[in-house]
Amino acid sequence: MKGLYQVTAMRAKKIISEEVYGNIAEKDTLFNRLMTRHKIPHARRHEWKLQEVKLNKEIND
């Protein structure tokens, strides 16, 4: 299901969250878009863990 998702990730005690567009079946893509928006380099992304993916708005194509 495509739409706008609120994606949250955590590293140690730091939490980042952002609304990103994507498909719920592709959680890796949603996670990567979150990391890109917060300018987290690829070498440091393994430190972050996906916490929550919540649908904000469904978009039908």
Which residues make up each language-model segment?
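Ordered hydrophobic segments in well-structured contexts
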Residues: 4-8, 20-22, 49
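A short, exposed loop/beta-hairpin motif centered on an aromatic-Gly-Thr core
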Residues: 14-26
